[in-house]
Design a protein with these regions (language model features):
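Short, intrinsically disordered, mixed-charge
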Residues: 35-39, 74-78, 125
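Hydrophobic beta-strand-centered segment that forms part of the acyl-chain substrate-binding groove
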Residues: 51-60, 64-104
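Catalytic strand-loop segment that frames the active site of acyl-thioester-processing enzymes
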Residues: 2-60
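HotDog/MaoC-like acyl-thioester-processing domains
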Residues: 1-17, 95-146
Length: 146
């Protein structure tokens, strides 16, 4: 993972704003995700079994890449104080052990009255999209005394 915790208030956001972070997937990350999610599908955990699948080897859980989106939303854009309320996802390609996943979120709409911010979410490996979708968050408002 790269990047320090940042963040912005609703009033500081504009359509087109974006943030990105990179995450390198290790076998330990997949094993830990399997432990916390209870998703122990052998395609993620058993190399011999995974070799018999169309993927021809272990792959990361799709939701691990989705968790990386959550990290960017919660740490950077909008950042701390935001609430993740929805996400659509399309998994385009597998993510493998050793891959570096570059996650970018971009503001596509802002509803000031409700503080709802809609963002496009894209995860890429070597410039190829592995996952994309759209997220909605409630962004924190600036303090009245600021």
């Amino acid at each position: 993972m790269s990047g320090a915790v940042a963040g912005r208030f609703l009033e500081q956001l504009a359509v087109g704003d974006s943030a990105a972070r990179s995450f390198t997937v290790g076998a330990a990350d997949i094993d830990a995700f399997a432990a916390v999610s209870h998703d122990r599908n052998p395609v993620h955990l058993d190399e011999a079994c995974a070799q018999t699948t169309p993927f021809k080897g272990r792959i990361a859980h799709g939701m691990l890449s989705a968790a990386y989106v959550s990290a960017v939303l919660g740490n950077d854009l909008p950042g701390p104080g935001s609430a993740y309320v929805s996400q659509s996802l399309r998994f385009r390609r597998p993510v493998r052990i050793g891959d570096t996943v570059e996650v970018t979120v971009t503001v596509v709409a802002i509803e000031p009255r409700t503080a709802k911010v809609t963002l496009s979410t894209v995860a890429k490996v070597d410039g190829k999209t592995v996952m994309d979708g759209e997220a909605a968050v409630l962004a924190p408002r600036a303090p009245k005394d600021a």
